[in-house]
A protein has these predicted regions:
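Short, hydrophobic-biased segments on the C-terminal half of alpha helices
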Residues: 60-61
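Short, intrinsically disordered or compositionally biased N-terminal tails of bacterial proteins
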Residues: 1-16
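Basic, amphipathic "hinge/linker" alpha-helix immediately C-terminal to the N-terminal HTH DNA-binding motif
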Residues: 75-94
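A short, conserved structural fragment
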Residues: 64-72
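Mid-protein regulatory/catalytic core that forms ligand/cofactor-binding pockets
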Residues: 7-10, 120-231
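Key DNA-contact positions within bacterial/archaeal DNA-binding proteins
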Residues: 54
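Short acidic, hydrophobic short linear motifs in intrinsically disordered regions
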Residues: 36-46
Length: 240
């Protein structure tokens, strides 16, 4: 099956009414919160997805009845074995779609996350399996985040929050969290400065914002942008 056929089949199977699956979206969000070191709470889902508090509470209650998660005594959301398996599957499809969109179709780096949010809900298991073959040796998504199930990353995916690394000197941008991925305009600004995973960066705090500088091989600043401290918490870096 050619890559064009994979794309055609995926789109043919997509029903517009099924492009967004709320349960899958919530499961993936909980998994992403865990990945970013954020305690999964209903309030955090409100922040991430922009849904109202009552809507999130109703959806979470339904998911608990369906055996996908538990609401713990401290309000933390804990995925059940079934819920985690489903969440992992959705996240893997999302990140495979991102790689296909960027590496094969040639979509702009700043736009592939938003587009993949639609694809993750309509990709069949057969298409997923074929993409895994066609995109072999792909263990991270375009934003440096791990591909679920990639054994090559076992024990190697550690990075530090950018806000904990202020004034730490020259660093390497390791990965970019979902809240920044969801901002297409901000991602485009990152791209213009070459601020992709693997780039050399310098960080400094200025009040309630963080300056993220793009550095050349000599450590000279090529350009920079400023982002709110809250967003900087979703940049992950490594020391050189």
């Amino acid at each position: 099956m050619t890559l064009f056929c994979v794309y055609y089949r995926l789109m043919k199977e997509a029903d517009v009414a099924d492009l967004i699956d709320t349960t899958e979206m919530y499961l993936k969000t909980i998994l992403e919160l865990e990945e970013d070191g954020v305690t999964p709470l209903r309030a955090r889902i409100v922040d991430r997805l922009g849904h109202s508090g009552p809507t999130v509470s109703q959806t979470v209650a339904r998911m608990e009845r369906d055996g996908l998660l538990h609401v713990m005594g401290d309000r933390r959301l804990e995925l059940t074995e079934t819920g985690r398996a489903h969440a992992t599957e959705v996240l893997r499809k999302h990140r495979l779609a991102e790689r296909l969109l960027l590496d094969v179709i040639g979509m702009d780096w700043a736009q592939v996350h938003d587009e993949a949010c639609r694809w993750e809900h309509v990709m069949s298991d057969a298409v997923e399996a074929r993409l895994e073959e066609l995109l072999s040796n792909t263990c991270v998504d375009p934003y440096g985040n791990p591909m679920p199930g990639c054994e090559q990353l076992q024990g190697t995916h550690s990075a530090e929050l950018a806000v904990r690394s202020l004034e730490a000197g020259t660093l390497t941008l390791a990965r970019i969290g979902e809240p920044i991925q969801a901002d297409t305009e901000l991602l485009a600004s990152f791209d213009e400065l070459g601020l992709r995973p693997g780039a050399r960066v310098g960080l400094s705090a200025h009040g309630d914002v963080v300056r993220v500088a793009s550095l050349d091989e000599a450590g000279e600043v090529r350009g920079y942008l400023t982002i709110p401290m809250a967003l900087a918490a979703h940049l992950f870096v490594r020391g050189e």
